[in-house]
Swiss-Prot record:
This is Serine/threonine-protein kinase US3 homolog. Its EC number is 2.7.11.1. The active site is at 162 (proton acceptor). The keyword Thylakoid does not apply. One of its GO terms (biological process) is symbiont-mediated perturbation of host chromatin organization. PROSITE patterns: PROTEIN_KINASE_DOM, PROTEIN_KINASE_ST. Residues 49-334 form the Protein kinase domain. One of its GO terms (molecular function) is protein serine kinase activity. Keywords: ATP-binding, Host cytoplasm, Host nucleus, Host-virus interaction, Kinase, Modulation of host cell apoptosis by virus, Modulation of host chromatin by virus, Nucleotide-binding, Serine/threonine-protein kinase, Transferase.
């Protein structure tokens, strides 16, 4: 199917659900968002799709659950007006891996770039929300898929920069993919850290990215560690702001990570020019000995194989985090079936 023709059609049809999503926004902002969403939807319908559902608007634009009118295939269409959507399309056209979201096609409409993507049953965030706990083998199967995706990206000089539960799509624990490449950075020098700009999500970003220090592929390893922790605790958040932290910003987030980990001054990255070293090393006081279990492990009773993996991935110094390839060789993954069976079969 060719999705590459420009569409020149407009209408004013709109899901009423989006009004509920925007209930807390300023009235003028809501009106503008509704108008822009209606334009995106009109272009999608002109391109030969029927919109089934409008998802909550994101930073890059709008996402719709759709059905292709001729084939009756269920798809997801992302419609964005920012550079991240174009970047995502370019990256997805040039990569191919079983656990990375597949780009089925693209089209443009007015100022929108639209990506046609396969539809999965849910994302990992909602998957965890629907369950009180999941089996360790399921967690490790999902994490293995995420690490395989990250390994492939890093080998192709791409840093995802926004690995999180909301960007991991799942049909079942053996059918998982990493998506949403709007924050991705390429091409990168995987052998040398550099500041590629701010991107991602504060709650899941690595300390060096939060500090605006030079960074590299290890930022994805940190975020994947947060994902594994959330699976192990079934949605608990390790480094979310608490009642004492006020508004969540990078400075507060770094201090929260340092406090909850109990980072010893000797565990800071050895770089006199780095913000983490220059500003935060001197403010940290801890009785924890360097190289011992992080302070947060005292609050959770995690299986040792999961705790060990998470601690390795959440090393405060990026140079101490293993690569995705190295992590996949850890003993925790040895007994996980590959391919992982579909529990409904």
């Amino acid at each position: 199917m060719n999705y590459d023709d420009d569409c020149l059609y407009e209408d004013k049809h709109m899901d009423t659900d989006i009004y509920d999503m925007l209930a807390d926004e300023d009235t003028s902002d809501v009106d503008n968002t509704l108008a822009v969403c209606a334009t995106a939807r009109a272009g999608i319908e002109k391109a030969g799709f029927s919109v089934l559902e409008t998802f909550t608007p994101g930073a890059e634009g709008f996402t719709f659950a759709c059905i292709e009118n001729k084939t009756r295939e269920n798809v997801v269409i992302k419609a964005g007006q920012r550079g991240g959507t174009v970047t995502e399309a370019h990256i997805l056209r040039n990569i191919n891996h079983p656990v990375i979201i597949r780009l089925m096609g693209t089209f443009t409409y007015n100022s929108f770039t639209c990506l046609v993507l396969p539809r999965y049953k849910t994302d990992l965030y909602c998957y965890l929300s629907d369950r009180r706990r999941i089996a360790i083998c399921d967690m490790l199967s999902i994490e293995r898929s995420v690490l395989r995706a990250i390994q492939y990206l890093h080998e192709n000089r791409i840093i995802h920069r926004d690995v999180k539960a909301e960007n991991i799509f799942i049909n079942h624990p053996g059918d998982v993919c990493l998506g949403d490449f709007g924050a991705a950075c390429y091409p990168v020098d995987i052998t040398q850290n550099k500041y590629y700009g701010w991107a991602g999500t504060i709650a899941t970003n690595a300390p060096e990215l939060l500090a605006r220090d030079p960074y590299g592929p290890a930022v994805d390893i940190w975020s994947a560690g947060i994902v594994l922790f959330e699976m192990a605790t079934c949605h608990d958040s390790l480094f979310e702001k608490d009642g004492l932290d006020g508004d969540c910003d990078s400075d507060r987030q770094i201090k929260l990570i340092i406090r909850r980990t109990g980072v010893h001054p000797s565990e800071f990255p050895i770089d006199a020019q780095a913000t983490l070293d220059e500003i935060y090393r001197t403010c940290q006081k801890t009785s924890r000995k360097p190289g011992t279990r992080p302070t947060w492990t005292n609050l959770y009773e995690l299986p040792l194989e999961l705790e060990y993996l998470i601690c390795k991935m959440l090393a405060f110094d990026a140079h101490k985090r293993p690569s995705a390839k190295a992590l996949l060789d850890f003993a925790a993954f040895y007994d996980i079936p590959d391919p992982y069976p579909n529990p409904t079969n």
